[in-house]
């Protein structure tokens, strides 16, 4: 077998008949599969052992040779080779066709490749292939010219002969008529009898004339057709064609079906065709030019590769190995078989029938019909349903053809190559394990035993609890007591991977150290739930065991949960204490007045704890405690002679002192109430300033304290805790009066219906807000629900408002707001009518969520596909370019404050140019920008920075570490080999389900630009580079505007400053203008409200501006939903969208006009041309949507496994594409290690050697006295170096 690690590229091409025959191990001649009596394969059938190999290991068909000792022998009786049965998975056969057939992919695909090559319309092509028209394959022009006059004379002679015959026939008939009339007259017949005779004679004569004229016309037609006959003409009139063939058969050849095409392809001159097409492109315009360009692409594909166009017509069909289209016996003696077998049987049956008809010399029409049926059978085998009605099996189900085997989610690519199942895995329900450390998980004993079975068995043998592996296996299966001891020894320090589906980002699979637990549920640390998005309502998780030492090392170093504290999307901690822990810490750090022990002083924390235990001190009482090792805050009053490290009297509460015990020793004393915001700031700070180990320990301590005090806080909820605001009725009455007034104005006709709606909505929104404010003021702070909401543990004021205040305005099914509010709260209970109008929104919400999940998953899939080959390949690409970004904004008093978007823009990047303040370099280029550095710069008055960005990176493949900046997940500069493309796709896709789906309708005049697309559809629209609905034009020139009214709408006319031609922009009356008459506009300025078309931005303002536009617009959507994603992730995707250039002028290069090429290749080719003194080609940057960009990738494997599988493979085979295997998907498909992370050669080619100390420790021998072993002398304690030690020598015994 071919080893996957020994090739660098994978090429796909068109197989010729010779190729198919060389792959084959024999011809399949019969449609039989297996004998239903003996259940053995039939000879020469679709499962024949002689062709495909034996069905049993080392055993021939007739049973003469059995056992492995006959390996390789071919039985002389049955002709079967004695070998392993698994060769039936790799040996192919073939069917020799009695007539050639075309490959449906090349004839029926869009565009038809055969049609482009031969310049035939697909309809005409179909007529030829399916025997509805003849095609001329060759014309002997010389002979025709040479014999032209004699042929013409021959035709003239024939015509004259016909004329002469006609004249003589008419004459004879006239004579007969005269005789008849004379006879009748003699008999004295009546005049009408005579008239009838005359009329019938005249009719006959007219018919003779007509027949002769028709014959003459036919001769003329035949001659005209022959005279102008040229290669590739189609002739649908069979009679005419036959007559032509009879007369002038020496001068031309023609035919129908695939055979005619095959003949044409053999004589097709590719080079001449390419030359004439180039000429057309150079001189032609419009439609002709575009068609010539498309045709040239196909023609040059055949010219430049080893492919021959004859490969598109098949003389024999390959038969795939039988084990890939199996036939299995079911219980009832019936057989289940793969659809392919049925399709192959149709082909073989029709082929055999055609052979027989040809042998019998059947009439042409019957043979042609059989050939057409054979063509259809082969079409159905390759791609059933592509042409005409699909072939159906039992129950009218279309049969699955070879193409269907590859296509779609259930196809070979996505189901088997990219979605493999793995061994050493198990799954179970999860429960919480609050006693675990951050890097641990609880693994049920039975699961652990099954997963680590091989390890346990080996260890049992090593410790000689079992004689051999077999008895060890028996011991494990019987679960002997000693097995459990061995198991706990085996799993120490052997991490396992836990994964929860759906794995939306890389934190969905993490490594933990297993702790054996009783029961059958996996226990999970509460802090990693956020990363897994897990809860304990019946979720399940999967466990995987890393086997090799390398896999274990990677799991421990890269995947251990305590090393994955930061979220790759924004670089902020993901292991945040939540819910109970927050309420516990809030309870711990709150301060209360008038409680036991207030105002006391304690000499130490221990003393205060003692007082607390004696019930003399309340946890939240304000007291003074003398603490040691405190890091004071700026707000604390310090004694004059105090130094760092001295004891300090702190005004605090016992709870806060205990809370500070959980934090690192040198952390600033926290003397405030700790709610969710505060806690999040503390954890952020820890992650930024302390090593991972310290952070993990602190988080565990916070978790312990949180749960401990949450239990003791006695947080409960009862219906009495839901307090209704006291002034609710009064508030509602005032607003009711206002609403009544508006209604009256409407009824009097003073305002329109839209205005009434709008005003009512505003009134009731205000009312709802007032009730909410009243509620917030009226609720006592020690109320448990109030504490839950204000601490940030669960719920928000809006939910509170609905529970205790009023539900407010609701939307109808169309998404418009109903102008009557729901005045009741859930505490009071809703009326039937109110309940009914609330159901619309609830139902829509559920439907929305279901749709959103699917859409978001598909978006993630497309993002991954477009960015999967973006890997950090080098340390620095050496560019000087970068993007300028703001880091500060001015307050009203002129002072600077940190810009709101620094978190997602400048943070974690590399500085591109030195920062200079007053001539002094404050920060050199190449510095990493963290929180501390940015704050320092803002203090120095720096407002914006030029930073490195992926968009300006000049690496040829992937990107470089400096342009990418910090890896957000590790907080350090990104490692070479990091798959930043996948991380980016996951970071954008993972919060996709949180985005809304709705297009908001506020109904009426409130909406500014019609319906703005928001949420997920907007993100998709941007990444697919679609023109948005109701897009706003942007000015192409700088100049003054004037607005003109037309009968259809309005138009904005811009008069350029440089006196060029005026530019007009038609806009509808509904669009809100952003300019007035006489406004001065700049290039690229928006003229009306609405979304801008990114393609226009690219055309008018260039690639850099469109990149910034896309990043900002995507961020706009995510920010509006409160999702924080770093710009660099979006930049990675946008960079992939603008990676290609469309060639406009070819000039001296080899690039074809209209071709899409990667910018790197375009620049390389131009450099080559210029070095040779030629003229470089010109191109324009192209903005491609992510789907299109994925399909345009250099890797055909990746594109085929993404979408439109058959189309991608058709193209790739025709162009003889070679896959460089640079991305991740391609390597997963062929089973290589991915070229990212530790799969890169720079990490693979490493030797591990122990240090001297390690060697000494490992091999040291205890010294022994010379008394014990006198003859040896004193032991040196020196280890024997391994390489000098010969295990095989006899003296070793």
From Swiss-Prot:
Coiled coil: none annotated. Zn(2+) 1 binds at residues 60, 62, 75, 78. Keywords: DNA-directed RNA polymerase, Magnesium, Metal-binding, Nucleotidyltransferase, Transcription, Transferase, Zinc. Its EC number is 2.7.7.6. Its cofactor is Mg(2+); Zn(2+). GO terms for molecular function: DNA binding; DNA-directed RNA polymerase activity; magnesium ion binding; zinc ion binding. It holds the Pfam family RNA_pol_Rpb1_5. Mg(2+) binds at residues 535, 537, 539. SMART domains: RPOLA_N (SM00663). The keyword Transit peptide does not apply. Binds 1 Mg(2+) ion per subunit. It catalyses: RNA(n) + a ribonucleoside 5'-triphosphate = RNA(n+1) + diphosphate. GO terms for cellular component: DNA-directed RNA polymerase complex. One of its GO terms (biological process) is DNA-templated transcription. InterPro entries: DNA-dir_RpoC_beta_prime, DNA-dir_RpoC_beta_prime_bact, RNA_pol_asu, RNA_pol_N, RNA_pol_Rpb1_1, RNA_pol_Rpb1_3, RNA_pol_Rpb1_3_sf, RNA_pol_Rpb1_4. Zn(2+) 2 binds at residues 877, 953, 960, 963. DNA-dependent RNA polymerase catalyzes the transcription of DNA into RNA using the four ribonucleoside triphosphates as substrates. The RNAP catalytic core consists of 2 alpha, 1 beta, 1 beta' and 1 omega subunit. When a sigma factor is associated with the core the holoenzyme is formed, which can initiate transcription. Belongs to the RNA polymerase beta' chain family. HAMAP family: RNApol_bact_RpoC. This is DNA-directed RNA polymerase subunit beta'. It comes from Kineococcus radiotolerans (strain ATCC BAA-149 / DSM 14245 / SRS30216).
